[in-house]
A protein has these predicted regions:
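Class I S-adenosyl-L-methionine
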Residues: 2-92, 97
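Short intrinsically disordered, low-complexity coil segments enriched in acidic
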Residues: 1-7, 111, 127
Length: 132
């Protein structure tokens, strides 16, 4: 966070984490919750590009693993297409962290040899999967 000029952050970032941001940083809130997007994903991508083009060191702060239903792939694809370097420092997805925190194994050689993580949300304009 010390090296960032601007922090673009989501709704899932706790107040405790936000309190670690040093003074003098620009903050841009782009939080989304299911059914309520204060900023659409396409606009978030454009904000990332705008700040990078302005020569700023941008920190995109997301909860969990940005590549597990976090739209991280869309964001880095946008940056890569324009030739901007990026670094991913993933957190732990809640699909793994919550059961572990509760002492519930996700796999166990006597009971479960695999697990699946499936979103319950369809892309806008598409139907939810009936198989869920």
């Amino acid at each position: 966070m010390d090296e960032a000029d601007v922090i673009i952050y989501d709704a899932l970032i706790s107040a405790e984490i936000l309190s670690l941001i040093p003074d003098g940083k620009e903050w841009i809130y782009v939080g989304k919750r299911s059914g309520h997007h204060c900023v659409r994903q396409e606009e978030i991508n454009q904000i990332l590009l705008r700040e990078a083009k302005a020569g700023k060191n941008v920190l995109r702060l997301k909860g969990g693993d940005p590549f597990v239903f976090g739209r991280g792939a869309e964001e880095v694809e946008c940056l890569a297409a324009e030739g901007y370097p990026f670094e991913i420092i993933p957190g732990v997805t809640s699909a793994l962290a919550v059961p572990a925190y509760a002492g519930i194994p996700i796999t166990h050689r006597d009971f479960a040899s695999s697990f699946h993580v499936i979103t319950g949300h369809a892309k806008e304009g598409q139907k939810n999967r009936d198989s869920l």
